[in-house]
């Protein structure tokens, strides 16, 4: 990878930090505001330069269409495990759920990722989490309102934005075609499996 200018390194760190804190990349306008650019167009030029250097991928058609690329080196049992279908009642990292391992440095995400989860469906497409993507997940058991989480609701695993109000939890999609999932903790089971800390495109080359 070609060396980055100080400004490019600053933007790349901002992208990683925003994903760690909110579960999604920043918009061009947010980058411009935080780093003092006069316009979102200035941020766009820096993003294009980062994309040319292989540091990010830009997905057209969405304001948050920024992804962190990665390449698979082999399928040995090292690196980050890719979780496929999750059986009811089983821990998400149970060996039988692991499809393969990717040679991904967990520290490229902030906080560090513990596993990858294959995205199914388009309920989070408005923040750039698309069908077939690999979602980098930092394993935790608790979440704050507004964070994008991997949650298990009565043994169904889903990726949604978390909101808790008293004894009720709402899991919000980022797609207007989907209604929130309402969970009443007084009689329903909900487990936080982790926080979304990054998205990797699941292309044929990966």
From Swiss-Prot:
Coiled coil regions, renumbered to chain: none
Catalytic EC class: hydrolase
Site (Cleavage): 88-89
One of the GO BP terms on file: proteolysis
Catalytic residues in the record: 123, 160
Molecular-function annotations in GO: DNA binding; serine-type endopeptidase activity
Catalytic activity, EC: 3.4.21.88
DNA-binding region per Swiss-Prot/TrEMBL record: 28-48
Annotated keywords: Autocatalytic cleavage, DNA damage, DNA repair, DNA replication, DNA-binding, Hydrolase, Repressor, SOS response, Transcription, Transcription regulation
Known partners and oligomeric status: Homodimer.
Function: Represses a number of genes involved in the response to DNA damage (SOS response), including recA and lexA. In the presence of single-stranded DNA, RecA interacts with LexA causing an autocatalytic cleavage which disrupts the DNA-binding part of LexA, leading to derepression of the SOS regulon and eventually DNA repair.
Protein family according to the UniProt entry: Belongs to the peptidase S24 family.
Protein name in UniProt: LexA repressor
Origin species: Shewanella sp. (strain ANA-3)
């Amino acid at each position: 990878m070609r060396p980055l200018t100080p400004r490019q390194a600053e933007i790349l760190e901002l992208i990683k930090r925003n994903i760690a804190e909110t579960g999604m990349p920043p918009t061009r306008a947010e980058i411009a505001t935080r780093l003092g650019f006069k316009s979102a167009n200035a941020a766009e030029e820096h993003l294009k330069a980062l994309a040319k250097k292989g540091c990010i991928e830009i997905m057209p058609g969405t304001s948050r269409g920024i992804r962190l690329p990665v390449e698979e080196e082999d399928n040995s049992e090292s690196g980050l495990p890719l979780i496929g279908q999750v059986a009811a009642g089983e821990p998400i990292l149970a060996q039988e759920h692991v499809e393969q391992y990717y040679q991904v440095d967990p520290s490229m995400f902030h906080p560090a990722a513990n596993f990858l989860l294959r995205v199914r469906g388009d309920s989070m497409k408005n923040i750039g989490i698309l069908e077939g993507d690999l979602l980098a997940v930092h394993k935790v058991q608790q979440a704050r309102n507004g964070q994008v989480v991997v949650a298990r609701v009565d043994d169904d695993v889903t990726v949604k934005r978390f909101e808790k109000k008293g004894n009720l939890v709402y899991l919000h999609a980022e797609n207007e075609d989907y209604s929130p999932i309402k969970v009443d903790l007084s009689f329903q089971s909900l487990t936080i499996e982790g926080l979304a800390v990054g998205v990797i495109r699941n292309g044929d080359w990966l």
